Amino acid sequence: MNHLRRNLLLAAASLAFATAAHAKDPKELVIGTSSGPYSDQLKLGIKPILEKQGYKVRIVEFNDYVQPNYALAEGSLDANVFQHIVYLTKFATDNKLPLSSLITVPTMPIGLYGGKQKSLAEVKNGATITMPNDPTNQARALVMLAKMGWIKLKPNVDPLRASERDVLENPKKLKLVPLEAAQLPRSLADADYAFVNGNFALAAGMKLTSALSVEKISDSYINLVAIRTADKAKPWVKDLEAAYRSRAFLDATNKYLAGYEKTDYQLALEKTLKK
């Protein structure tokens, strides 16, 4: 509890300082994010682009998924980057916050990594596969297994809510072992395969590109930039969106964010550049 309180106090102090500076300088943008990969995405990809346009960019990191939206709604932040549309919509509706999505961002997929087995072709009857135990990410893992043909899910199951109860056929008698997401990288020492979320894979020193299979992320799970709805037409919002759509950010994505799933606008830009 003391650790959580200390983190919240530090975040509040950072926000107070950022807000004071922001009040003096309208060209300063304060962007909130979760610590780790999405903070790095801002620091390496977006901040340099905006600074070349004369903006000062301050990045505030949070250790929870609640404060960033409250801080945005209250005006301490100009934008935040940490959530997908399902979470934003529910949180904003439940708490009556006037927040909107601006643009999607490159997102880390969940991947199937090899433990005792180093290729998908080596899968054996009775293989042990560890997977996240939270409903959202477990559904993602089960849908991947179904698409790979290793299991069959019940007809018409909602892919966003699939659970072990929805496994209709398991011809290889795979042993599906749900674990806390943070434990999944360590489980590779004992399991044949493990589903690992991108942020935990990177934290464990794994490369996203080492995954044997990677999900095609549903639009529902692609992370985004959130802003206050009232700010949609402001010039800085247009500049922020343009930074994400830029060639410079695409180059940064290719250089620093290997393994992230690119956005539709980045894929379209790549296609244009190849012509």
Predicted features, each with a name:
Residues 59-70, 157-186:
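Short helix-initiation/N-cap motifs at beta->coil->alpha
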Residues 109-120, 222-236:
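A bilobed periplasmic-binding-protein/Venus flytrap-type ligand-binding module shared by bacterial periplasmic
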Residues 28-46, 63-67:
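Extracytoplasmic "Venus flytrap"
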Residues 65-96, 111-112, 118, 201-205:
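Pocket-flanking alpha-helical
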Residues 102-152, 250:
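A conserved helix-loop-strand patch within extracytoplasmic ligand-binding domains
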Residues 139-146, 244-264:
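Periplasmic-binding protein-like
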Residues 90-102, 117, 190, 195, ...:
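Ligand-binding "clamshell"
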Residues 73-83, 127, 150, 172-174, ...:
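Alpha-to-beta junction loops
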